[in-house]
Amino acid sequence: LDGTVPTYSVTYQGKTIIKPSRLGYQLAKGGKDLLSDFSVINEKTSTFDETWTPVWGENKSIRNHYNDMLVELKQNSTDSYMNVRFRVYDDGVGLRYEFPQKGNLNYFTIKEERTEFAMTGDHTAWWIPGDYDTQEYEYTKTRLSGIRPALHAAVSSNLSQTVFSDTGVQTSLQLKTDDGIYINLHEAALVDYPAMHLNLDDKTMTFTSWLTPDAQGMKGYMQTPFKSPWRTMVITDDARKVLSSNLILNLNEPCKIKDTSWIHPVKYVGVWWEMISGKGEWAYTHDYPTVKLDGTDYVHAKPSGKHSANNANVRRYIDFAAAHGFDAVLVEGWNIGWEDWSGYMKEKVFDFLTPYPDFDIKTLNEYAHSKGVKLIMHHETSSSVMNYEKYMDRAYQLMKDYGYDAVKSGYVGNIIPRGEHHYSQLEINHYLHAVTRAADYHIMVNAHEAVRPTGLCRTYPNLIGNESARGTEYQAFGGTKPGHTAILPFTRLQGGPMDYTPGIFEMDCANGSHCNSTICGQLALYVTMYSPLQMAADFPENYEKHMDAFQFIKDVA
């Protein structure tokens, strides 16, 4: 304590890395802020050392070795209790808040978490703008003092975005001091809590946590006992150790799925790049400017001739996957509703059950299985999350009925319920519910546009992939600078693997965009960005022109 104010600091190799920084919460709805008036009532220390085996991952086994300290605090005037737990590893520190069911603090509403990270100087930073709804920005490299002048230019257009501050950034944030110390700030075990951003005071070079609000502007609704996510600091003098750190995984709970025999890596191709690059479409018909799930007559609609998820085309991808040893074929645009799926804030966009007339779900799955290939389901929600939860069990059961064991989910557009954000407490709970419910059906999940991962793949290893960053699709939307992929392993991938969807061999897209890459650059991504889920994203015919390079994907991915 600094007087009655909770604080902490971090040193590494005798150097101060985090200067004395305050801890606590501002409360809403009449609650007294948990920022001061504290006394220490107890301290407990311990050491823990284990080796655990992940279901999948870069390492066959992982050592989890740390020193633990629990500081029990009491706010004297309110009889409220707030504990802070620290775990110190060789490669960094984690801290979290723990609220026991004790005293007068039973329910409270968070106005803001006030965890500080006081930097020792004007460090170099690799960052993306703080945003409640998207992480799909290119990374910018500046000094901390350069964030404010550069932030406006760093904000690119997205279908859903809410930038909150001129100095706000997202985690995982990678920093480097002038004397060569690397600092990575992120969070671990994000459960029942809004995602954390960081807001910089560029006069003092202090970051303060900034949580994602709900539709009412509140940051979180808490009931004791509860534990916050971990606030993580990976600290090293060797950049390679940032990449090899398992601190975030170790701060998550052990696997909660008893039987994991059905969880496995997946190498796949898919009906996806056709639509992204402008060659085909998700929608079946141009007959209707608007469609309704229970009222549109697709049987008598005229096919547009551009619908990519048709029987013949899907068979072509199945044949290609089987011929080259791929596990699966993703098919997007198989289900009704795509004609007006985005931009209209519709609640009932998809039912996740009804295929278009030219997609025979039974026959195609039987054909794929006969070739030793599985289809990957696609559940684009258009961010209507309550509608998805309404259909979720029926949609997962449909998958089991036809032999699917993996789903790619999507959350494009503004969140419904209206006014909510992609990273608010409600949505964090939804994303985890989709994963845990999928586990009940033995289904693996690859979530796109969801919150950036925080190591929960240790606890729920059926979460085999996330997008949660600017991926390959943006190469068809005007291009991405090559340096972006070089920083992703130090930032976005710190919390878990990314479904980056590499493997583009034809750089000129049908929509006129040009991919800022090369075939060698695309092949390198299979090595530099680990994922148990790897896509060869281009068209079969483009791979057939370069079978020598394609062999690398077959051998390495």
Predicted regions mapped to residue ranges:
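Short, flexible loop/turn elements at secondary-structure junctions
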Residues: 75-77, 88-90, 121, 236, ...
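N-terminal accessory beta-strand-rich subdomains and adjacent acidic, glycine-rich linkers
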Residues: 1-258
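Short conserved micro-motifs at the rims of enzyme active sites and ligand-binding pockets
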Residues: 128-130, 186, 195-198, 242-246, ...
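Glycine-rich, aromatic-lined ligand/substrate-binding cores of catalytic
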Residues: 508-557
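Aromatic- and carboxylate-enriched substrate-binding clefts and catalytic-loop regions
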Residues: 332-509
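An acidic-aromatic substrate-binding cleft motif
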Residues: 223-324, 328
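Short, hydrophobic/amphipathic alpha-helical patches that form generic packing surfaces
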Residues: 274, 488, 502, 522-531
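Active-site-proximal structural scaffolding
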Residues: 110, 225, 262, 307-310, ...
